[in-house]
């Protein structure tokens, strides 16, 4: 029992001493001791010389607590970061042993002490917050360790590769470097290794997700010497949800809307032209709005490829009706119709004259019409209105005569007369078929029917190729 009490007394003694010291420091009667200590530390302190001047380089440890990433701008190629930036180093000139506690001093004391000449290499604009006072902290430890903290908002350059935009990933860095001191005078390191940077996992961005981050320590060589550099690199993955709702879905719906013209009657010119022009102008507006939110870069982005593809489909749908309109209502079909009617009239007149010249006492050789069958004749006449058919040439039946030879038996003569009569009857029937007028086109054209299938199939294939390529 005695031994246990002794052990308890031994272990509790330092705690009691610390409590007494703390109380003595806070005691107004002992405030003079603290004041004397601070005055002694600052008296004769030369801010122009680094710690251990002429000796080994000063080791400066860095800590960053990220408060927020306020903005990532593709137009300016930068991002804005608010952070608590802390640096720690040992300055033996500031060590003390009279007070066994840390001294947190007024931020204005920092102007009287040596601090590292740290700067952000890729910084565009930075400032230290000053509400309600300048956000700086100076804390001294008995062994001379100095902790210097700042609350900083910095806008930092981030060179982005937007070829896969908006399906891209970007690497943005924060480069920390000494401006004047070389590696002979100062060294930088991450204080706490992988735990030197905190707050990254708590950050939420509207268009990005922080996939990963890494800490880098290196030395860079310039003409003036070798300098220490620390790098904090963020890997940002863009969230595609916003762009699907704002760009991709409207483009898809507008492209599908342009196909409605394939189901509108081809003679409804006003409706089809208005629909085509409206969809083309809408796609142009989407393209223009997108360009305003992005920098003027020389290469083609992924979203440019998609919008360009949608624009081509919409524009081709408008050209499809221009083709249909020309085929059905242009001058070409009218000329074909008139030429076909003229040829049919001439053929009918020629056959009528040739039939009247037939003599039953002559040996007549009738060659058949150069029409394969009645169905082919009907299709040829009906096909005059087909835009893909060329001008059909109607050849009259060639009728050849030759002088009668030796007299034949009357039986054969009668048979020949009956055969000639049948031929004449069939010729008249076929000739009458050539007089059929070209009917008015009231059915949907074959081009429209094929377009209803061709456009959706090709657009679906385009989407499959696009998403497989850029997502993977």
From Swiss-Prot:
It comes from Bos taurus. The extracellular domain contributes to synaptic contact formation. GABAARs subunits share a common topological structure: a peptide sequence made up of a long extracellular N-terminal, four transmembrane domains, intracellular or cytoplasmic domain located between the third and the fourth transmembrane domains. Glycosylated. Histamine binds at residues 119, 178-179, 224. Disulfide bonds join 158-172. The keyword Coiled coil does not apply. 4-aminobutanoate binds at residues 179, 224. GO terms for biological process: cellular response to histamine; chloride transmembrane transport; inhibitory synapse assembly. Residues 1-23 form the signal peptide. Allosterically activated by benzodiazepines. Allosterically activated by the anesthetic etomidate. Inhibited by the antagonist bicuculline. Potentiated by histamine. This is Gamma-aminobutyric acid receptor subunit beta-2. Heteropentamer, formed by a combination of alpha (GABRA1-6), beta (GABRB1-3), gamma (GABRG1-3), delta (GABRD), epsilon (GABRE), rho (GABRR1-3), pi (GABRP) and theta (GABRQ) chains, each subunit exhibiting distinct physiological and pharmacological properties. Interacts with UBQLN1. May interact with KIF21B. Identified in a complex of 720 kDa composed of LHFPL4, NLGN2, GABRA1, GABRB2, GABRG2 and GABRB3. Beta subunit of the heteropentameric ligand-gated chloride channel gated by gamma-aminobutyric acid (GABA), a major inhibitory neurotransmitter in the brain. GABA-gated chloride channels, also named GABA(A) receptors (GABAAR), consist of five subunits arranged around a central pore and contain GABA active binding site(s) located at the alpha and beta subunit interface(s). When activated by GABA, GABAARs selectively allow the flow of chloride anions across the cell membrane down their electrochemical gradient. The chain crosses the membrane at residues 240-260, 271-290, 309-329, 451-471. InterPro entries: GABAA/Glycine_rcpt, GABAAb_rcpt, Neur_chan_lig-bd, Neur_chan_lig-bd_sf, Neur_channel, Neuro-gated_channel_TM_sf, Neuro_actylchol_rec, Neurotrans-gated_channel_TM. It holds the Pfam family Neur_chan_memb. It is found in: Postsynaptic cell membrane; Cell membrane; Cytoplasmic vesicle membrane. Residues 24-239 are extracellular. Glycans are attached at residues 30, 102.
